[in-house]
Amino acid sequence: MRTANAAAGRTMRYSWIAVGLLWLAGVGLRLTILAVPPVILLIQTDLSLSGTEVGILSGLPVILFGIAALPGSLLVARFGALATLVAGLLIAGVVSGLRGAVLNVAVLYAATIVMSAGIAIMQPSLPPLVRAWMPHRISFGSALYSNGLLVAETLAVLLTIPFVLPLVGDSWRWSLAVWGLPLVAICCAAVFAACPVSRLPRRPF
C-alpha cells in the first residue's frame, strides 16, 4: 500500500510538472518575438532603418513560422518532440540575445530569421508532447501552451518600456538580450524536468 501511494504521489507530482512545462513552452513561442515592437523606434533610430526595412523586420517572423513549420515536423519525426522543443528554445533564446550585438540591418535580419526558425520548429513539437504527457486531458494540455503564448504576448509588450528598458539604460540591445534569458531557462527546465515526466504513465488529474 505504501509503495502504491508513493507511486501515485510521484505520478501526480510529475503531472503538475508537465502542466508547468507545457505552459512555459507556450511562453517561449512568443516572448522574444513580441520583445521587438516596444523598442522598434530605438532600433530604427540606432540603425537608421527606413520604413520599408522596419516592415521587413516585423514581417520576417511570420514568414518563418510558415516556412519552417514543415522542417519542424520532420525534426519531431526524426529526433522526437522533446529534443526538437529543447533545440528550438535554445536557438531562439541565444540568438535573441545576439540580436543586440548586430551592427547593421542585414545582420539583424539574419539573426531574426534564425531566431524565428527556432521558434517555428518548436510549434510542431507541442501537440505530440501533450499527447504523451496528458493523453487523458489533451484539450487541457493544448489550452495550457495556448495560454502561455497569450501571456507572453502581453508580458513582453507590457513590461519592456516601464521596467526592462530602465534596468538596461534604455538600450534596445540589452532589452532583447534580457528577453532571451527566459527561453534559455525554459530550455534548461525542459531538459532536467521532462525526462522523468516522460517515463511515468499518465493518468487524469
Question: How would you describe each model-predicted region?
Answer:
Residues 22-26, 30, 96, 104-116:
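Helical-face signature of the major facilitator-like transporter fold
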Residues 17-51, 69-72:
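Extracytoplasmic
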Residues 67-106:
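Conserved MFS/SLC helix-loop-helix module at the cytosolic interface between two early adjacent transmembrane helices
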